């Protein structure tokens, strides 16, 4: 399900046909981390480490941008989940339309944290 031009995964992974679907940073970073760590621990074949590294490279090439105040990480879904959540929302339905309606953020902590985890695994591969 990787997107050919970014090497990342879509917000709604299996629905490339959806208008507004985009390469999403936090989920892609978690997949990259899992692939690299799994390969390092011998739980996955070694070539999966390289696949994870390519996903992380795609994040860097697509969404890591130099801003006025330094580097910024773009393309992070603000938050998506099921059920009402802490703010008692009723729109968290789990439909593709719901997932695509959540706004994209810059430097959101769950996206940045997932990227830092993936980068730490990529550095261990070096």
Segments (PLM) and residue ranges:
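CBM-like carbohydrate-recognition segments
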Residues: 23, 40-126
């Amino acid at each position: 399900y990787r997107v050919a031009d970014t090497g990342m995964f879509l917000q709604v992974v299996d629905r490339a046909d959806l208008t507004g679907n985009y390469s999403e940073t936090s989920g892609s970073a978690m997949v990259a981390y899992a692939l690299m760590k799994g390969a390092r621990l011998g739980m996955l074949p070694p070539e999966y480490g390289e696949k994870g590294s390519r996903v992380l490279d795609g994040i860097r090439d697509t969404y890591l941008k130099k801003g006025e105040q330094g580097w910024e990480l773009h393309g992070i879904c603000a938050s998506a989940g099921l059920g009402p959540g802490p703010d008692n929302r009723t729109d968290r339905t789990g439909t593709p339309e719901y997932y695509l309606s959540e706004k994209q953020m810059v430097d959101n902590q769950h996206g940045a944290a997932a990227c830092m985890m993936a980068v730490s695994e990529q550095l261990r591969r070096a």
